[in-house]
Amino acid sequence: VQCEPLQPSNCGFSVAGWSPWFSDKFAGAPVKSTAIALAQQDGRLGEFVITRDGVEGSLIYALSASIREQINQHGAATVYLDLLPQKTAAQVQALLNKPRGSKSLSNHLRSQLGLEGVRAGLLRELSDAAIFADPALLARAIKALPLTLVQTRPLDEAISTAGGVPFEAMTSELMLKQLPGVF
């Protein structure tokens, strides 16, 4: 009987490696009100959770089949996080362009954009330090922060699996074509 290898589905994904600081501080933290997109798909709004070595949660599970396919084909998949989906890129840049006076950049991001905690941590973890000096680059990063995922979590951690007996090996009544009478 034809069988496809089992693969995790509705699962979390590992990143190439969080820094120890980020992992220690934010593992288990929910990332709320965020959008995520693969390059070829529209973004989805929701939330996910930072894990010690990656990400998981409903927003990740919704794209898990597409992410898994990208990893299988290319060895990695890059998703883009919109940390402020309720604001346009122009609105974000306008708020970043406001004078911050003696406030630190962290306080400016918090007071102008409400960007703090795990979302601010993601921005620092996944961005080159140079973008923080340029409001246009910073606004682009906030609206499309690249996160590279390198592998699915193991089968025993997945909510469900893909693979097994393919539909083309069965009749419309779900009987195995090679073994008549076996459903």
Outline where the language-model segments fall:
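Residue-level recognition of phosphate/Mg2+-coordinating polar/acidic sites
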Residues: F26, A35-G181
